[in-house]
């Protein structure tokens, strides 16, 4: 950070992100007294931002909770092994580096030129969930932000024929872990600017050489074009995700359409 203007910008932005993070945590009751929170730290801008916000809230919160930062070293070529340990030691944050060669597995299974992100993320999730259970973690914190949630909604809508996104809080399918997304109300624009001002030691996410998920790239570009024409478009879409009317949809599991009959008419 080079000047007073940058410092003032950082301070204002930090307060803004912290406020949104606290709102999401409170609204969805993400953190309870005595929680042990595992922050999944990839070395990307969003997970750095998440860790920073939780550390700030830890100092101010009326409840007590532990934080442990966990990184999975997947043995990708060129991965800078010293970056995260040095950063976390300097901050005085408890951390653990899990070392698992998923890179070789993914490269063996996925054909050349195909995106490896899907299999890689599933393997990563399983390893992190196992670590959380083995170390008595009560909440697994992920760095997904508002834009990730909106993009996932449209990915499912366009390509899977389903209406679903990313919840701010969930109990994993196997009931072993609770996953929280404290940055759910924060935009990617905010995490990007914050990471630049804080000068986080970013680790690229494409060390494996995988191609970007073209479907997600298409959705992201589409949303950005919409946002250019209407700066509130993403906010409106995000608001819609918590303003659902089951009776105005077509899902018989969410609303009892079958038993609506002429006997219900009131005149």
From Swiss-Prot:
Positions bound to [4Fe-4S] cluster: 117, 120, 208
Organism encoding this protein: Francisella tularensis subsp. novicida (strain U112)
Gene3D superfamilies referenced in this protein's UniProt entry, alphabetically: HUPs
Gene behind this protein: ttcA1
Keywords linked to the UniProt accession: 4Fe-4S, ATP-binding, Cytoplasm, Iron, Iron-sulfur, Magnesium, Metal-binding, Nucleotide-binding, RNA-binding, Transferase, tRNA processing, tRNA-binding
Listed GO biological process terms: tRNA thio-modification
CDD domains tied to this protein: TtcA-like
Subcellular localization: Cytoplasm
Recorded catalytic activity of this chain's protein: cytidine(32) in tRNA + S-sulfanyl-L-cysteinyl-[cysteine desulfurase] + AH2 + ATP = 2-thiocytidine(32) in tRNA + L-cysteinyl-[cysteine desulfurase] + A + AMP + diphosphate + H(+)
UniProt-recorded name of the protein: tRNA-cytidine(32) 2-sulfurtransferase 1
Cofactor(s) this protein requires: Mg(2+); [4Fe-4S] cluster
Record's subunit section: Homodimer.
Protein task: Catalyzes the ATP-dependent 2-thiolation of cytidine in position 32 of tRNA, to form 2-thiocytidine (s(2)C32). The sulfur atoms are provided by the cysteine/cysteine desulfurase (IscS) system.
